[in-house]
Amino acid sequence: KLGQANIPMIVTNHTYDVIGAYVPTKEMGGGSGLKYAASTIIYLSKKKEKDGTDVVGNLIKAKTAKSRLSKENKDVTIRLYYDERGLDRYYGLLELGEIGGLWKNVAGRYEMDGKKVYAKQILKEPEKYFTESVMEKLDEIAATEFSYG
C-alpha cells in the first residue's frame, strides 16, 4: 500500500560479518525478507575525522549493496562536522570532477582553467572554484557515474 501511495519507507538495521565466508562480507540481521522486499539497501560505516589529535567529525561511507534505481556497489564518502559547519557540501567533488574529466590531477595539484591549485587551497575557499556552472557539470557527471543509462 505504501508503494501505491508513493510513500517511501525507511528501515534501519544492524549488520554483522559472515563467519566462515571465503571473502569477508557483511550481512543484515533479521532474515532474508528485507533483502528481497527492499528497493535500495545502503550500508553505512564511519571513521573519525581529526584535526591534529582532536576529533572534529566523521567520514561516513555509504555503499550501495542493492538498488533498483542506481548502480550497485558504488561508494560515496560524506564528511560530517560536529560543529556548526555540519555536512560538508564540497567533500568528494574534486575526485568526482577528476573521474568525469572536468579537471586533471597533476603531481598532487588540480589543473583548473590552466591554473594548478592544491586541494587544500580549493577546499579553503570552495565557493571560488565550485561556481554554479561547475556544480551543474558535476551534477551531470554524478548522474552518469551513479545512475543507469
Protein language model features and the residues they cover:
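Phosphate-binding/switch region of NTP-binding enzymes
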Residues: 1-100
